[in-house]
């Protein structure tokens, strides 16, 4: 029997047989001239090449198993590689909390001209701060909570005109604060707290600077006048600092030096000129194009082969070979027309050992088995603190989401099965139903339906998002409120019925109706993982050292933060910290803006359809702040929240809008359900 040959090999062999001398000449010609051409015309590295070279610099780069050289980091807006942020190209790198060690070398990433965000927070990198000023298009740099040390050069941030957010907190940096920080024209947020910076604070003149944190350093001298409206807590822990908002300086204190910032002196290189150079470039480009075409043919073949792999390749082979049986609450039939296992709702005692089988909790969906998932075309949707999510399109036409959990080891097998059965009984238009699950001691799979409009977070925070108008945002908030209230009613024995409420755990269907995901999983999660990562444990009441624990009102607090996130378009950065940090709280920022009578600046500038809706937007903002009271007993009950949110309207008529006073309160009976303006800034005044 003739051995099969791939088309690329067959074509080459045929060409060689027909015209061997010509082929040899072409090969020699290309092999000689291509290196010369490439030395003159540099082809930019691909994002994948840059990322792979960067991975090789990491001491524990072996953890990046999804960074496959045979696959692309991005497929449209979906990331195939862990920690990569995509918008048809790689625009961000988010490798947080991975225990990465050693020195951080960012040089391999410099050719990635579309890179806008770099985040390595909560790792164990040490050594000096990496060089970043060659990333001239960078907008955000997050390096907090590592072990970086040493002085940061004064010009470390020169030539970075787009840089808006810099987080260097909780490292061991020393020396003076680099003067180039003061020259960043678009700086919005700067966090230098928890280091060993010395000397005086430079004069920051940026008008849009909203937050600057210098606490717990060794700084001295007067606080620059441009920063004297900041929260006093931003300067705490520096014994030598003085002047507003701290105590006045003594008469002998020197003035604040204005540190001159040298302009960037870009180096320019003159391109080769003349007819000879032009002809050589033309020939080089032609040869490169020919080579690229040949490479593309080979890559297409490799890509087709790589598509056969999928997200379950990391599972032991035995798992893929097991026969999957349906485990449902009603009698059903499997592929062999034999009755599948059926379990009575009221049965107590030990559940039968599923033996590693896929178990269905719904009977209104077409059955599939693990082999269908193994053969499915899978895409990586993302990787969060709970686990990785995959989109799987199986042969029957169903599109599913499979999520792998590695920290669901808080209960035994029987308790886990019982809880999954309980979740399978939930039925509400704003709850994403569980379809099936797979149990192993080491990790679990939860299978749900795929929602076409991605998560709420992607619409609020992705660079390529068109944004959501007011009507859609209000619709989403109303749906989330009803879904959360349903969980409160159906899961009364759970301390926190949801426990992980945030915008990335809310998906949107084709009509932008919201559905809650990752709900009611706290009983299954390991305590350490839950305390470190679940949003409920970032609430102000969670202070185990003081005996304060979470309650059902904690979910109300999370919902309030979500309301503020939807209205402001700002990401709640306290989710990135462990525990509650009022300095990083979105609630604190909103209250500060209200106290300064800048309520109009709170709302997302990207939100459309705001005309004649200001009253309703302010009313929703008040509801959000009521939900976010630091004292639990002052927060609203969930049913009260739903009632108030349901009363909000999409817009006001001209008459209604004209009947409002300048503070945004109605003069009709509707306002009796809401706060008056004296209560609007409650957390600042009480």
Swiss-Prot record:
Ranges in the topological domain labelled Extracellular: 40-283
A Pfam entry, by short name: LRR_8
Glycan-modified residues: 60
InterPro entries in UniProt: Kinase-like_dom_sf, Leu-rich_rpt, LRR_dom_sf, LRR_N_plant-typ, PRK1-6/SRF4-like, Prot_kinase_dom, Ser-Thr/Tyr_kinase_cat_dom
Residue ranges, compositional bias (Polar residues): 328-339
Keywords: ATP-binding, Cell membrane, Glycoprotein, Kinase, Leucine-rich repeat, Membrane, Nucleotide-binding, Phosphoprotein, Receptor, Repeat, Serine/threonine-protein kinase, Signal, Transferase, Transmembrane, Transmembrane helix
Top enzyme class: transferase
Protein family membership: Belongs to the protein kinase superfamily. Ser/Thr protein kinase family.
Protein's UniProt name: Pollen receptor-like kinase 5
Organism of derivation: Arabidopsis thaliana
Gene symbol of the encoding locus: PRK5
